[in-house]
Amino acid sequence: MKKAFVKSYGCQMNAYDAARMADVLGAEGYTATDTVEDADVVVLNTCHIREKAAEKVYSELGRLRVLKGERKAQGLDTRIVVAGCVAQAEGAEIQARQPAVDVVVGPQSYHRLPDLLARSRERRVVDTEFPVEDKFDHLPRRRTLGASAFLTVQEGCDKFCAFCVVPYTRGAEVSRSVAAVLAEAEKLADGGVREITLIGQNVNAYHGDGPDGAPAGLADLVRAVAKIPGIARIRYTTSHPNDFDDALIRAHAEVPALMPYLHLPVQSGSDRILAAMNRKHTGDAYRRLIDRIRAARPDIALSSDFIVGFPGETDADFAETLRLVRDVGFESAFSFKYSTRPGTPAADRTDQVPEAVMAARLAELQALLDSQRHAYQRAAAGRVFDVLVEKRGRHPGQVAGKTPHLLAVQFDAAPHHIGQVVPVRITEAGSNSLFGELVSEAAAA
């Protein structure tokens, strides 16, 4: 029996794409394996957002080249596939640097994977075109489902932030129709999924065709998905502040299934740096938007992205970022040193910030963000949350799940609770997750 190993790097959309590639291969008779040494096909679904992520791929390819040679000596064939955004950006270079790679396929073409694998037996293949056909129309039914699932509703980005490669690797903004999204969501619900996360590079720019042919916004889509029987929870990511409209804010107040958690990247607190990044908003505009969202949903938990050391960033600029973090308060956040990406406007700037300065600023920012995260987790102790149980826990007799605010919880319970939403009292806050105890409905009330 043929086996496939799929490894994904980076964002939630990459996780979705990796799962769909596994489905495509499954429809061709491949079974999934967690052991790369056993795989007849190895797929690396790559991320190009930072240099470090791309170099990880090349390091992994070096190991796979050795593995491919060892399997060949045993009479076993191994096909190596590089997919995702590194593939899109560096297709020919990948094969030049690593001849062991058989297929390079971009994020819009992976529905062609079976054909590409067949062609690769004659010669190595690169497919990084943006095809006319919609890849979603060619994807098979999902084969493996859990309690929660990602669902791509929008791809690409038209914002062209000065540091970002996404518009070049994922293309212009494209939205799936409401009907197409609902059809996939209904299949997920039929398969036992209780929570759907609607994903896109700029998901709140969603403008898919609605039932009447007119463009629908993300708020319209959220309300439609919320009507599907069995779907108890809805989330969405990732958003841009400039596309956050009143309808979406109202949805947070009016749609019970829309969870009180929002990932809304700001990148910097300095207006000067935000302008240089081409973000087209200010720090105060972000603060005002957060105030409006919190007025609609006071218990909402916030997450964000931050870049330190963008070219030209001064100590005063960085201080503005720290001030914004203190003003807003975040449950969690992702923070990184600026990474030069070839082909982006920021890469050509001559005022790059020294590595040591970036490292010091990142450490200071992460210490502040960690203190906010730990305070948020400590405040959860003693409270009861509805937890969606997703899987078995770290230890025997435990299960693990997420609160509405996306906090991870471990607690003792039987595995038959997986897929259920149950009340859990938080008893302890750990460094990365909460611990709790299952309580009765009466006690929760």
From Swiss-Prot:
It is found in: Cytoplasm. CDD domains: Radical_SAM. Keywords: 4Fe-4S, Cytoplasm, Iron, Iron-sulfur, Metal-binding, S-adenosyl-L-methionine, Transferase, tRNA processing. Residues 2-122 form the MTTase N-terminal domain. [4Fe-4S] cluster 2 binds at C157, C161, C164. GO terms for cellular component: cytosol. It comes from the Bacteria. Its cofactor is [4Fe-4S] cluster. Residues 378-440 form the TRAM domain. Gene3D superfamilies: Methylthiotransferase, N-terminal domain, tm_1862 like domain. GO terms for molecular function: 4 iron, 4 sulfur cluster binding; metal ion binding; N6-isopentenyladenosine methylthiotransferase activity. It catalyses: N(6)-dimethylallyladenosine(37) in tRNA + (sulfur carrier)-SH + AH2 + 2 S-adenosyl-L-methionine = 2-methylsulfanyl-N(6)-dimethylallyladenosine(37) in tRNA + (sulfur carrier)-H + 5'-deoxyadenosine + L-methionine + A + S-adenosyl-L-homocysteine + 2 H(+). Belongs to the methylthiotransferase family. MiaB subfamily. Monomer. Catalyzes the methylthiolation of N6-(dimethylallyl)adenosine (i(6)A), leading to the formation of 2-methylthio-N6-(dimethylallyl)adenosine (ms(2)i(6)A) at position 37 in tRNAs that read codons beginning with uridine. This is tRNA-2-methylthio-N(6)-dimethylallyladenosine synthase. It comes from Methylobacterium radiotolerans (strain ATCC 27329 / DSM 1819 / JCM 2831 / NBRC 15690 / NCIMB 10815 / 0-1). The lineage of its organism: Bacteria, Pseudomonadati, Pseudomonadota, Alphaproteobacteria, Hyphomicrobiales.
